[in-house]
């Protein structure tokens, strides 16, 4: 079963790492993990797209999306169980993928505190842990 999950009032600060575990639905086109201060202030929009064999990262400020950063290292696959981490540094995010590959994305909005997490699409999150 897939759907949506939102966590509000989270306390993610620079130096924190979010560990995410879950399963990717069979037949899905992709999923989205958002981190920021709300639905219209996303510091990291992380979007593996299976139909395009790419991972798209972006930021959202109000109604304005930034320039997409595309990563062709797609090590996720539908029907699999995965673990990956997102580390928040003051100026960037480091996403460590299940195979150990790491991608970075700048903290374009410059926030020093993230309170919002959402998961959408074909990903069933079984656990998440925020470590400082």
Swiss-Prot record:
Keywords: Lectin. Pfam families: Gal-bind_lectin. SMART domains: Gal-bind_lectin, GLECT. It comes from the Eukaryota. Residues 4-131 form the Galectin domain. Gene3D superfamilies: 2.60.120.200. InterPro entries: ConA-like_dom_sf, Galectin-like, Galectin_CRD. A beta-D-galactoside binds at residues 65-71. One of its GO terms (cellular component) is galectin complex. CDD domains: GLECT (cd00070). One of its GO terms (molecular function) is carbohydrate binding. GO terms for biological process: cell-cell adhesion; positive regulation of apoptotic process; positive regulation of inflammatory response; T cell homeostasis. Disulfide bonds: none annotated. This protein binds beta-galactoside. Its physiological function is not yet known. Homodimer. This is Galectin-2. It comes from Homo sapiens. The gene is LGALS2.
């Amino acid at each position: 079963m897939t759907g949506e999950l939102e966590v509000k009032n989270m306390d993610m600060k620079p130096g924190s790492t979010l560990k995410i575990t879950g399963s990717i639905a069979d037949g899905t086109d992709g999923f989205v993990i958002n981190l920021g201060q709300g639905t219209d202030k996303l510091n990291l929009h992380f979007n593996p797209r299976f139909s395009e064999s790419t991972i798209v990262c972006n930021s959202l400020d109000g109604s304005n999306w930034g320039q997409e950063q595309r990563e062709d290292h797609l090590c996720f696959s539908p029907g699999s169980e995965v673990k990956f981490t997102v580390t928040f540094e003051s100026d960037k995010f480091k996403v460590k993928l299940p195979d150990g590959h790491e991608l970075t994305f700048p903290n374009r909005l410059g926030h020093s505190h993230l309170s919002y997490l959402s998961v959408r699409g074909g990903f069933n999150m079984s656990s998440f842990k925020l470590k400082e």
